[in-house]
């Protein structure tokens, strides 16, 4: 049974439009080096692997949250599904005492979580598993949302100097459309005592969103406008992110999130890709 969080989710994705909202940027200290992108080995190819996003709304004071943690762990051990999704944990249930909490996580849950914890939502929408946290329910939704080929491919490079993270992103369209790019910083291995934990691994929290960059749209969730791209077109954008002192950069990675405008003008997740800090991720071709 899900635990009702006594807050109101005031900004559901169903109500999200393309209205711009000014956001004060994070300012890194010191010089920010923007790394070079990896070479595209197949410039004429636009058949890209597709990954959906699983967004876990959770927190260390949530005694029911280990139920979803158990299902996500089991999902990660299914070879048929590991390449079909990226998992993000938004620690938003409690700000006090949760070392994985961040304002970025709170923004995500404000936008997409119904207010019940734990909850798993999909592709930056309010679509969720309902009352079931079973692995079979999650895989059924993955099967429904996953595509054989993505509408856009992602290549990226990330580097760190001090607390300054520099990220370089290139996207290549397989389908004509209007695209946006955002980058999120995820941290692994955060130790925090989990209410309701029955095993020690539940006290280690990974894929926790710690920071976001991507300008002004809806709390930075949807990202920077890249404009209209035709099939085969590429677009590039660089980002800088200031990492908080509480974030252990050596345990972090970058999730590149690309959203595409639908016929109603609202943005939906088109693809996402993980990039190691100090490394690169090349286009993932089928």
Regions found by a protein language model. Give the residues of each.
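Bacterial Sec-dependent N-terminal signal peptides
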Residues: 2-50, 282-286
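Local sequence-structure signature of Cys/Sec-based thiol-disulfide redox active-site neighborhoods
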Residues: 38-79, 83-85, 90
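Short, conserved sequence motifs used for protein processing/export or organelle targeting and
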Residues: 86-286
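Domain-level signature for proteins that mediate thiol-based redox and metal-cofactor handling
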Residues: 14-15, 19-22, 44, 77, ...
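A generic structural signal for short, solvent-exposed coil/turn residues
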Residues: 10, 46, 54, 79, ...
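Short N-terminal helix-initiation segments at or just after the protein's N-terminus
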Residues: 24-33, 59-65, 200-201
């Amino acid at each position: 049974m899900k635990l009702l969080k006594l807050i109101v989710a005031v900004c559901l994705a169903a109500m999200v439009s393309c209205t711009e909202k000014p956001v004060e940027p994070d300012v890194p200290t010191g010089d920010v080096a923007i790394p070079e992108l990896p070479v595209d080995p197949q410039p004429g190819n636009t058949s890209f692997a597709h990954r959906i996003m699983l967004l876990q709304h959770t927190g260390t004071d949530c005694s029911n949250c280990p139920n979803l943690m158990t299902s996500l762990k089991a999902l990660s051990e299914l070879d048929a599904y590991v390449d079909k999704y990226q998992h993000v944990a938004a620690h938003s249930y409690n700000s006090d005492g949760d070392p994985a909490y961040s304002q970025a996580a709170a923004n995500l849950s404000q936008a997409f979580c119904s207010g019940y914890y734990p909850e798993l939502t999909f592709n930056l929408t309010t679509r969720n598993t309902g009352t079931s946290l079973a692995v079979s329910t999650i895989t059924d939704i993955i099967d429904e949302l996953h595509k054989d080929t993505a509408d856009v491919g992602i290549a990226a490079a990330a580097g760190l100097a001090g607390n300054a993270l520099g990220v370089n992103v290139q996207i290549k369209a397989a389908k004509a459309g209007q695209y946006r790019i955002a980058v999120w910083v995820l941290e692994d291995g955060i130790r925090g005592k989990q209410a309701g934990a029955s095993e020690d691994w539940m006290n280690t929290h990974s894929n926790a969103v710690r920071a976001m960059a991507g300008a002004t749209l809806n709390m930075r969730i949807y990202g920077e406008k890249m404009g209209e791209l035709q099939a085969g077109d590429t677009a590039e954008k660089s980002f800088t992110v200031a990492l908080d002192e509480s974030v252990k950069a050596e345990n972090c990675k970058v999730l590149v999130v690309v959203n595409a405008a639908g016929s109603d003008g609202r943005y939906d997740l088109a693809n996402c890709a993980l990039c190691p800090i100090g490394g690169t991720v090349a286009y993932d071709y089928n």
